[in-house]
Design a protein with these regions (language model features):
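Structural alpha/beta core scaffold segments of enzyme domains
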Residues: 160-163
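N-terminal export/assembly segments and adjacent metallocofactor-ligating motifs
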Residues: 1-156, 169-170
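A glycine-rich, hydrophobic/aromatic-adjacent loop/helix-cap motif
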Residues: 166-198
Length: 198
């Protein structure tokens, strides 16, 4: 079963067709030598811990590989952490005065987050949506459903204390996803608010 029998608790290297125990430095050195000069690809799943993802990134870079941030085509810049993590915490929704949703239907994509948005709305927060109309369980103002509407919203934006801008994955997986992300970040900055990527 791997937990009680035959559990790997030390690294092994193959020598003359047989496995023998080795130190971590020897095992990693053997693996690095075997990978040297070959094309290497690493893929991290959505549920992998950040430490494992970071270790894989370092290994791929040390072997001369390049790092792609997403496999779904999302235009998230790997070099700008705030662009893919955001600057807002979920708890910021509890005190938000204005929430702007861009290219997302949180009722489908993140129901618990949608409940937090509803709670903020019940406490007086204004909600604006850039995207198709949907039943989100709270009232909102539609700014339009296209990129021109997003640009117009950014151009007209003024500082509003307690603003949280939320961008959905659907908005940044399209060909102009980088521009959408940049506009969303500019909107948050211009409104003096925080930014969150679903």
């Amino acid at each position: 079963d791997g937990l009680r029998r035959q559990r790997l608790d030390v690294p092994y290297v193959r020598e003359n067709g047989k496995l023998r125990k080795a130190s971590w430095s020897e095992a990693l050195g053997t693996a690095a030598a075997a990978l040297k000069g070959t094309k290497v690809l690493g893929l991290v799943g959505d549920l992998a811990p950040v430490e494992a993802a970071f270790s894989l990134k370092r290994m791929i870079e040390s072997l001369g590989g390049s790092v792609e941030c997403r496999t779904d085509g999302a235009r998230l810049p790997a070099g700008n952490r705030s662009a893919y993590v955001g600057t807002a915490a979920i708890a910021d929704l509890d005190t938000a005065k204005r929430i702007v949703l861009i290219g997302t239907n949180p009722r489908n994509e993140a129901p618990v987050l949608n409940a937090r948005i509803r709670k903020a709305w019940l406490n007086g927060a204004a909600v604006t949506v850039v995207g198709p109309d949907a039943d989100l369980t709270y009232d909102y103002t539609s700014a339009g459903a296209d990129r021109a509407a997003l640009k117009a919203l950014v151009a007209a934006a003024e500082p509003v204390e307690g603003t949280v801008v939320i961008v959905g994955q659907g908005a940044i997986t399209e060909a102009d996803g980088t521009a959408v992300l940049a506009h969303a970040m500019a909107l948050a900055d211009k409104m003096g608010g925080k930014f969150l990527v679903l």
